[in-house]
């Protein structure tokens, strides 16, 4: 009995113990916690004896908005969101000012609480840089709108886009007119003033060429509409209106097949004609004009008969020395001045030899000039082999070229000899000492020879001055060009010398690096050598003449395209753009030959302005980088606003 009672009591105690343990395991323990990260986020939560949890959390986004969410659970443990609020964050609350004493004093207002440092104004994002400036919602374009077209004002003068004058209009018109046989008269002579072709014939060829161009464009694109003004007006402007992107809901267009075949010979002739057009020399690059010793009233060319064909400026001296000569005769070139001066009785109807034939004429004064049939550009090799080259046609309004071989040229111009010694040449031009007094440059001298550096020499020639002369480094060449004007007729100096030459109106000139050339014509179309060279070059435009940098070659011009004198016939600027902002900018000028020149800059966060000046041509992109630390006084604006914008197309003159 007692054992059973003991067992029952033990079981009851065990049951009570288990019940207590189980009840202790399911007992709800209340808690409370919370934390706050200043100006970023906060969290708070608590649980009561019934097991209900209540809490909230909040965070500040990058746009300065405080988002607070309040949540709670019911007795069953289900999670519910009580409220969600968003309001601007104003920073922590400042402490109130408490008066020190109880004496009646006016309480000072509490100091305004400064806004926190990170009061950002931007859209919320994750991992992005925060901006202090308010977001910009307006649309700002860099380009300025075009001015509205006025109905009463013609739009032909606009130079925007493809409304510019096409550079190949003249070449196409000239080619078509030549194919039609309308320019036969202009191709007969090489150095005479001929009548320009009729305007109607040129306009006819121009209309044919432009109609071919537009027909080809329409056949290729199919959506280009052309507007051509009246073809009878000589100054009619032609414009092209591109309607690219305009979708028409009509039936699909049917394009005509391209059955136009271009003549390759015609295109080559057009390119050749375009290359003969000299380019305009910018005003800063034009050489200075030497003052003339003769007033305009004494220049005999202005007293000629009005019906006569006026010779070019390079023929002034020959006309002045032969006022009674027939004006219908072919006036010799500037290179023939000396031979004409030595043979005043020779008929001007004869073809006067070029500079390469001067010595042979001087040695045979009785030989008839009619037997010499050489014309164009003669070289020393051609003279040695007694071969002729076909005549070269010049533009009537273009200065004739004065050229010879690339071999050592006229004596007095040193070649490959820094001391001034002139090598022997087989071109028939006297080298070294000339007849007469070569050191003093007597009047009987044919072509003076230059002397070594340190001496002052006057080369003999026409009149009292020198016709052709030159000196080596350190010396000075001087002389009078006879009736042409002051200075020698043709002259050049090496590095460090002072060369004077080329009377007024002459288109021949040249100087080398370190020299001081003077006496060029009103518009010098013939460039000298490149920087650092000692080469002399004579020719038309920048295509002929010149020497390679660093060389000491001399001679008149050399062959066409020799040295670095050759360049594309397209000159002048094609476009220009420029835009400047507070922190960056870019400007560039593009030429018609493809060259580009400009600069751009950018200011970084380190207050350093980086500027890149560049030139891009056939040699590649050539930049020059520079840095500049901005001053503390140069306050940087908050916004990168546009200050200047410009874009312009240039018409071809």
From Swiss-Prot:
Gene: l(3)mbn
Free-text tissue specificity from the UniProt record: Blood cells and other tissues.
One of the GO biological process terms: chitin-based cuticle development
Keyword Zinc attached: no
Region (2 X 21 AA repeats): 307-348
Cellular location(s): Cytoplasm; Cytoplasm, Perinuclear region
Major localization listed first in the record, in broad terms: cytoplasm
Region (Disordered): 425-448
Biased composition (Gly residues): 439-448
Keywords recorded for this protein, A-Z: Cytoplasm, Repeat
One matching Pfam family: Chitin_bind_4
InterPro entries: Cuticle_Struct_Prot, Insect_cuticle
Residue ranges occupied by any Chitin-binding type R&R domain in the UniProt entry: 28-91, 572-640
UniProt keyword Cytoplasm present: yes
Secretion signal span: none
Protein name per UniProt: Protein lethal(3)malignant blood neoplasm 1
């Amino acid at each position: 009995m007692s054992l059973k009672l003991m067992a029952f009591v033990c079981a009851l105690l065990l049951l009570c113990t288990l019940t207590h343990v189980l009840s202790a395991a399911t007992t709800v323990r209340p808690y409370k916690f919370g934390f706050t990260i200043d100006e970023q986020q906060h969290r708070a939560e608590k649980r009561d004896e019934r097991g209900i949890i209540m809490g909230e959390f909040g965070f500040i986004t990058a746009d300065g908005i405080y988002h607070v969410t309040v949540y709670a659970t019911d007795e069953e443990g289900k999670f519910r969101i009580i409220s969600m609020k968003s309001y601007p964050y104003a920073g922590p609350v400042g402490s109130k000012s408490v008066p020190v004493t109880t004496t009646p004093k006016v309480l000072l207002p509490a100091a305004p609480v400064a806004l926190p440092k990170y009061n950002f104004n931007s859209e919320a994002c994750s991992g992005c840089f925060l901006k202090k400036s308010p977001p910009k919602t307006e649309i700002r374009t860099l380009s300025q709108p075009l001015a509205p077209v006025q109905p009463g004002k013609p739009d032909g003068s606009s130079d925007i886009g493809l409304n510019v004058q096409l550079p190949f209009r003249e070449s196409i018109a000239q080619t078509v007119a030549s194919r039609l046989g309308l320019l036969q008269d202009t191709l007969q002579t090489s150095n005479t003033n001929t009548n320009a072709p009729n305007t109607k014939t040129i306009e006819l060829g121009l209309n044919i060429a432009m109609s071919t161009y537009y027909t080809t464009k329409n056949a290729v694109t199919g959506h280009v509409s052309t507007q051509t003004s009246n073809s009878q007006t000589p100054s009619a402007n032609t414009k092209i209106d591109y309607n690219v992107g305009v979708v028409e809901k009509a039936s699909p267009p049917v394009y005509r097949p391209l059955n136009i075949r271009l003549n390759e010979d015609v295109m080559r002739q057009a390119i050749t004609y375009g290359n003969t057009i000299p380019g305009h020399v910018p005003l800063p690059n034009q050489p200075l004009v030497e003052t003339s010793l003769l007033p305009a009233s004494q220049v005999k060319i202005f007293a000629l008969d009005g019906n006569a064909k006026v010779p070019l400026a390079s023929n002034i001296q020959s006309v002045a020395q032969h006022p009674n000569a027939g004006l219908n005769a072919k006036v010799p070139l500037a290179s023939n001045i000396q031979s004409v001066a030595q043979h005043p009785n020779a008929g001007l109807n004869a073809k006067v030899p070029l500079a390469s034939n001067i010595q042979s004429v001087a040695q045979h004064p009785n030989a008839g000039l009619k037997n010499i049939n050489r014309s164009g550009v003669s070289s020393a090799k051609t003279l040695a082999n007694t071969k002729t080259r076909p005549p070269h046609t010049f533009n009537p309004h273009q200065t004739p070229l004065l050229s010879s071989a690339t071999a050592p040229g006229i004596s007095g111009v040193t070649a490959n000899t820094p001391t001034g010694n002139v090598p022997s040449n087989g071109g028939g031009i006297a080298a070294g000492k000339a007849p007469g007094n070569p050191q003093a440059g007597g009047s009987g001298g044919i072509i003076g020879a230059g002397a070594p550096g340190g001496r002052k020499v006057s080369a003999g020639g026409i009149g009292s001055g020198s016709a052709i002369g030159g000196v080596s480094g350190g010396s000075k060449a001087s002389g009078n060009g006879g009736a042409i004007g002051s200075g020698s007729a043709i002259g050049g100096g090496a590095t460090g010398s002072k060369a004077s030459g080329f009377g007024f109106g002459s288109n021949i000139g040249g100087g080398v690096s370190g020299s001081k050339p003077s006496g060029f014509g009103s518009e010098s179309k013939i460039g000298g050598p490149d920087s650092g060279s000692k080469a002399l070059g004579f020719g038309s435009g920048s295509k002929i003449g010149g020497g390679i940098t660093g060389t000491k070659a001399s001679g008149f011009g050399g062959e066409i395209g020799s040295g670095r004198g050759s360049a594309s016939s397209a000159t002048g600027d094609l476009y220009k753009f420029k835009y400047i902002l507070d922190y960056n900018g870019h400007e560039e000028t593009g030429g018609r030959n493809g060259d580009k020149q400009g600069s751009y800059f950018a200011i970084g966060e380190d207050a350093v302005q980086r500027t890149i000046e560049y030139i891009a041509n056939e040699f590649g992109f050539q930049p020059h980088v520079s840095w500049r630390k901005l001053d503390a006084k140069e306050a940087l604006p908050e916004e990168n606003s546009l200050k200047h914008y410009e874009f312009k197309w240039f018409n071809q003159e």
